[in-house]
Amino acid sequence: RVELEKVLHRYQSNPSDSLKYKAARFLIENMPSYTYYKGKLLEQYLTFFTLLQEARSKKVYPQAMIDSIRRMYGPFSLDSLQYCKDVVTVDSAYLCNNIDWAFKVWQEQPWGKNVSFADFCEYILPYRIGDETLSYWREDIYRKYNPLLDSLRASTVLDIEDPLVAARCLCDSLRKRSRFFTTTVPQGLPHVGPEIAQSVSGSCRELSDYVVYVCRALGIPCAIDFMPLHGGGNDGHQWVSFTDKYGTLYFQEYPDKIKEVRKDKMCGASKIKVYRNTFSLNRIMQAEMQRLDTAVVPFFRDPHIVDVTADYAKTYKKKLEIPASMLYSGKPRSRIAYLCGSSRMDWEPVAWAEFDGEHLAFSDVQIEPVMRIATYERGRLRYWTDPFEMTVSGEFHVFTPSDSVQDVTLFAKYPLWQDEKYQKRMIGGVFEGSNDPDFRQKEVLFLIEKQPERLRTMAYSRSLTPCRYVRYIGPEKGHCNVAEIEFYEAGGLLPLSGR
């Protein structure tokens, strides 16, 4: 407390630092729920990220690295680490350094004039992203990356006063860096922190953290937006969001380009809810939930989040009312109901609403994913409906358990978006025919000009000339990713077979 009071006194005593005083208050008022961990075991496990790119060159897979680290240092456990609270450990020197550097970049960069003080406090000023171990990071990152924006600041063509233009210029440079993306990372680790993040290795969390550290160190406002669960998957996903000087929302899934949200397929991606991480505590949400129940699921316990689902969904229900006929009978012990998404063999709360056992409505929910209603009682979920989905037409489809057996045909057992990179690689591929095994004389039978469809694509030969040999040549960097090829006679129902 004494250290934090030093910060307030320093800026309060000088009238020219009135904004810095307000910024200091913003950080301190929202600091109580921030914690972090320290310890040798954490440092040992974080070497995983710094060694990823080296391991790739040696063809060592991430899971093998995790297994090796576990054998060497033992299983990872937060209980073995030192638990620290920001309000106890953050000293005046650290906080003042962070505030002074944040103000420096906000005031010196030309696009800073289009960043409000409120946005500055939320999206540039914070000294941390999540629960990473604290360190001084702003000056080092500023000196390393600020030269990347020299050409932008000198430009007479680009709108150097637009934060999005600065973000695009910077991220176009960051995209050129060597990186290693993998969803296979040690489980249970806190955020890796600014130094490890610059190894540009890990999952979407680590790569998003990297972009945020660099952008904020250079005075570019940004946030981490996330879906707690994919609508058609078992995991969540996160990315970095930006706004231009007019307030239009953009996003980047590093190392992709920055794209406008409303014009991208992100809006159509299957999901239930999207939230934005904020440094400030959502006191309105916290007060409303605590009014209804003192026991809240961990995800909503200290909500440093705001709901931005409406910004990321084209088809969503402003108010999703759950019919009383779908609810199980009984009396809930909690007045909070949670909308849950499927996560492997369990259900994970992603939204909440007031519940009296009969009336229930959730706000801003993207339809189509499978969901279920639950309350949080005695430390576990108590379910109030069978799993259900809402169709585009607004009808509920309930999956009621049955003892009967039903045969089904599965056309996919893996997220379909993973197929796209292979389908796109075939564009430009060509089928050729010849009567010469060396194809010294050949004829184009079919050129792939658009992305093939899933499962099966019908292709009709351009030539009616009989040929004995057929080959497929993939485009440059296409890798010839073809699973199966079958040939049919005109009007034939059975595939031809070679000799």
Locate the predicted segments by residue:
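Beta-strand-rich domain onsets/edges
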Residues: 290-317
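Structural motif
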Residues: 307-310, 319-333, 417-421
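Aromatic, loop-rich ligand-recognition surfaces of beta-strand-rich domains
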Residues: 403-444, 450-499
